[in-house]
């Protein structure tokens, strides 16, 4: 079947689009070549970086309490299994409880030793959220918590996860240090059977067992598994190496709460990477390292993050003024402004920018996440024009801030702002004015070789004592099963990743046929925005409704019914084709040379037009997507779903 898809992102001539500067085409060529040779490291030395450094194995670590599986126990059962105990998993658990399920109905599992997801694993110095904490930290209205700052540090974000778990008593229903390798649908029992393993917090041993669940939700995030680049010579390097997601305070000194890295005062430190993590960690390392060398493959645009302490008087007045539902309304106000390329405030609630930060002054980001205007014929020209003004201001700021002209030139971002997730910080560019800080521009090639002494680049050796890998996270496949690192087999043994190989097919972006009672929030065929917590919350709200209503459809008189719900073939085809019809909303991302928002990254590198279109998010943006789900629920008919049950 051929799907109309015009303009076709795969066929856009990059050179035909007005460029912000000539270097766009140069970086496109360099970065594409570099990405082609990028691999994940197979080094035995770096494989150790995947281990959890925060468990209580050395006596000075702290892990959250959870449920231990006795070695004699072989099976565990639950009505609803939630994979993931970060903000996503917690939101699903809370929304399920609010929809009427009991605490005993829910079981959460996570490979980490505590709650928090990415905020459990990431504890590097300088860590903070880059989305306003008043909209990013979930369930503020329900918990009554007031964030300390507009953008809070990582320790507070992790603490908030613990706060949510404590309020809803989720510790008693969570298995930490637990991984699931296989998830198999049992048609006869109308259950998912999970093969699980829980590691011992005090030893290297693990206990294997089975979890049976009526429903399963893959709520694991994408920012927990370190992306380790292939670096020839890494095993020969005499110094120390670690990834930012597994920070080694034993080597640097300090702790997550007090990052006084006094052991680096005489050290020569190298940082590989200049993405979102590096932007936060580089200024902190510069405060303590004897020498700091930053190896940059491609520059990133860093906007000013105007952080400040929360004014509690303002907080109370703002909540009283907006009333119940204030956090969701603030989230939706944020979503509206980051996609408002025409600067049209069509609704009363959107006339005032509530968040007022670098994000809400960045409407060209709609090129990456979709929006109400993306499907209009002149959108590509419009978004380029809007972004050119932003880029012009950013370049002027860099040139006026960084003293050395050559360094300033190397830091200039030469791609459109929507191509990579933007960064925001106070003081990143000023760091390069310090005499002991040096920027090494690899012109798109990246670091390709290590020696015993350090980094070898263009025949020159940079001697180092410590190499910090700020190389991001291994997002992996776009298939929900692969991202969860679980082999998922549905009806008749069908593998989910095999179905995804032909291109995703979903209903509302959260479920797929032949995999009944399975839900997976994600980006393909679903609404997306910069605030991932909001995305998780809307998905949790929708999935909780579906599961609750599925039970409500059970005929009276059934005791302990087994419910089976999945989309009909017609409904799945319809939603998939509706997504495909809007995929041209992301045509502007074809211009991008790199980043998680490129056509290639979102489609797994597919050159097939229809398959590429199937991988795209909902093109009309998050507000449109949420409205469709709300109207569907309001009807109350569960249209498009097949519901069956059996009981006694």
Swiss-Prot record:
Q: In which pathway does it act?
A: Secondary metabolite biosynthesis; terpenoid biosynthesis
Task: State the superkingdom.
Answer: Eukaryota
What keywords are assigned to this protein?
A: FAD, Flavoprotein, NADP, Oxidoreductase
What S-S linkages are listed for this chain? none
Cofactor list: FAD
Q: Tell me the protein family, please.
A: Belongs to the FAD-binding monooxygenase family.
Q: State what protein this is by name.
A: FAD-binding monooxygenase trt3
Gene from which the chain derives:
trt3
